[in-house]
């Protein structure tokens, strides 16, 4: 993750802390399907993705200028799900109304670990009103991951947050980068987090670019920890470990998505951290994924 993204999440934390939501709003949320499906459908020509989403960090510059217009553009492309990373100085009620007008749902959102640690009730109120099923932490400070002890303390915190989320009929998840695959004290941090967290309380959003960059095979983790990856970030890698639009790189998407049921994948979010043209990027990725058969 770049320093820009860390700053973006820090700003999001400040925005979340400034919001105060009445508890009564929690019952008004529109929720995505909770059936635990794979997000894919079968056909005579093979399986294909049914619900394709996008991580809104990809379009942050456009959303800051024209929030509703950008969401409307995503709906016109064909997206039906979005994943938030910041609320752009809007109230959850305002955002929910816009989503409903555009026919979009927000099954997940990224929230800073600090917000969930320091104000779990307020943060989970926001997630509930937005209609999330999953509340995701997308970054760990170095102090939370630089030793075996700190990793286990982080896992304990994840379990506590997961319990608080479960009490609200939400699920807590953690999103990886590549640092989780560099050994710390002889251990792989991602493995420690998976082993030390309760499978009934903590899930994972596998970023398929970053795990590839980290030198690991997603299928290995699907086999070792089945059902723990309900969310994936879909972004491609080209020569030189460059991030590119989905379909423009070398990642074998059919191979990965063929194991979606073992992984437990429910939601697929397209992302590109630094696209030259955000709308062109998410359009190209969407078209590739709509045509993919596996």
Residue ranges of each PLM-predicted region?
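Acidic (Asp/Glu)-rich catalytic clusters
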Residues: 42-48, 72-76, 90-106, 119-132, ...
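Active-site mouth loops of central-metabolism enzymes
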Residues: 55-65, 110-116, 148
């Amino acid at each position: 993750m770049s320093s820009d993204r860390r700053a973006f999440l820090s700003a999001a934390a400040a925005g979340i802390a400034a919001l105060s939501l009445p508890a009564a709003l929690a019952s008004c949320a529109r929720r995505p399907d909770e059936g635990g499906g794979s997000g894919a459908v079968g056909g005579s020509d093979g399986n294909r993705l049914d619900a394709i989403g996008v991580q809104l960090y990809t379009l942050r510059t456009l959303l800051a200028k024209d929030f509703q217009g950008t969401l409307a553009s995503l709906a016109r492309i064909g997206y039906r799900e979005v994943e938030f990373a910041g609320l752009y100085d809007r109230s959850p009620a305002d955002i929910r109304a816009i989503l409903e007008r555009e026919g979009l749902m927000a099954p997940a959102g990224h929230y800073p670990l600090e917000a969930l640690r320091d104000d779990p009730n307020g943060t989970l109120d926001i997630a509930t009103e937005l209609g999330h099923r999953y509340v995701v932490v997308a970054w760990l400070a170095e102090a939370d991951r630089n030793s075996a002890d700190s990793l286990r303390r982080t896992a304990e915190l994840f379990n506590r947050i997961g319990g608080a989320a479960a009490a609200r009929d939400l699920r807590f998840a953690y999103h990886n980068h590549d640092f989780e695959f560099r050994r710390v004290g002889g251990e792989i941090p991602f493995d420690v987090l998976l082993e030390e967290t309760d499978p009934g309380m903590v899930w994972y959003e596998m970023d398929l670019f970053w795990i590839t960059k980290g030198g690991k095979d997603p299928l290995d983790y699907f086999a070792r920890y089945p059902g723990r990856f309900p969310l994936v970030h879909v972004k491609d890698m080209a020569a030189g470990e460059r991030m590119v639009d989905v379909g423009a790189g070398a990642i074998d998407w059919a191979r990965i998505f063929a194991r979606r049921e073992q992984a437990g994948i429910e939601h697929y979010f397209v992302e590109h951290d630094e696209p030259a043209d955000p709308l062109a990027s998410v359009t190209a990725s969407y078209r590739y994924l709509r045509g993919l058969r596996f």
